[in-house]
Amino acid sequence: MIAARAANLQVAMKALALAVLALAYAAATARAEQCGRQAGGARCPNRLCCSRWGWCGLTDDYCKGGCQSQCRVSRDGGDDDVAAVLLTAPGGGRAGVASVVTSDQFERMLPHRDDAACPARGFYAYRAFVAAAGAFPAFAATGDADTRKREVAAFLAQTSHATSGGPYSWGYCYKEVKGATSDFCVPNARWPCAPGKAYHARGPMQIAYNYNYGAAGEAIGADLLGNPELVATDPTVAFKTALWLWMTARSPSQPSPHAVVTGQWTPTPADSAAGRAPGYGLTTNILTGGLQCAGGNGGADRVAFYKRYCDVLGVGYGPNLDCFGQAPFDGDIMSASAAK
């Protein structure tokens, strides 16, 4: 089964060759530094460290070597340390994603990610997830409690499908495609490929192509054009790339998955005519460019992961779970799991 999933991921890479993503809109909205003297003295949310370059994070690159504020925490603590120290709300208790999904619930959702059969074993840690989420303060912090739970369930469901070794508790089994036959480098003046580097699918959302690595790296403060391997070696960076794809609208007419699941998107008459409606199903449409909206097992798998995770979090599923019959926005593909 795992070999078959690997083959499916390779097929997904070929499907991505048909898409050219419109990144100008995303890059224009994600360029500014986040903290410190570069941002008027602002502090990072959730008590993350502010690096010398003005970016928020948890690793030693952020917390040491010129760190500007909130520098006492490094990534060496355990999961409980991250929740208690980094994600403490001003009035006590937990804040951010740690207030929505606990480490125990994370383990229940992804019990096999560290199985010996999974190439990503030991990589996708809860502490890396909550640290990465701290760089996106609106994630799991928009709307009421049920909305926040559904967003976490939706994000983990889509990324579980992208990295799955089987249904529906084998999410996060893979961290990159093995044996890629292409370097996924295409001509791009703004995001040129670095010599000898490959931009195949990596991380929870299986980010691929130099233009995605470049834009994501700029947004999170990492040189992913020069060091794309970071997405498969640094779990916090890996989660940040997935969250960037989740939080970023690809064009003014196409919402981010975050905007959809948190109720911030309202369909236009053109959207309604195209069958596009609020709900988890629309995130599949956005992430796959509509490739899984004509039926097939891929869309059904995504729904099954989502339902299971909603059950773990104790929240209802909401409407419109699949995208069957929905027209794509513009054919762009955000996730390399589009053909799975």
From Swiss-Prot:
Signal sequence annotation? 1-32
Q: In its keyword annotation, does this UniProt entry include Hydrolase?
A: yes
**Which UniProt key words apply to this protein?**
Carbohydrate metabolism, Chitin degradation, Chitin-binding, Disulfide bond, Glycosidase, Hydrolase, Plant defense, Polysaccharide degradation, Signal
Q: Which reaction does it catalyse?
A: Random endo-hydrolysis of N-acetyl-beta-D-glucosaminide (1->4)-beta-linkages in chitin and chitodextrins
Q: What GO molecular function annotations does the UniProt record carry, in alphabetical order?
A: chitin binding; chitinase activity; endochitinase activity
Q: Where is the Chitin-binding type-1 domain?
A: 33-73
Please name the top-level EC class of this enzyme.
hydrolase
The entry's note on the tissues where this protein occurs is: Expressed in pistils, stamens and lodicules.
Q: Any idea of its EC number? A: 3.2.1.14
Q: Which PANTHER family match?
A: CHITINASE 12 (PTHR22595:SF79), CHITINASE-RELATED (PTHR22595)
The entry assigns this protein to a family as follows: Belongs to the glycosyl hydrolase 19 family. Chitinase class I subfamily.
- Name-wise, this protein is Chitinase 7
Q: Which organism is it from?
A: Oryza sativa subsp. japonica
Gene name, Swiss-Prot/TrEMBL: Cht7
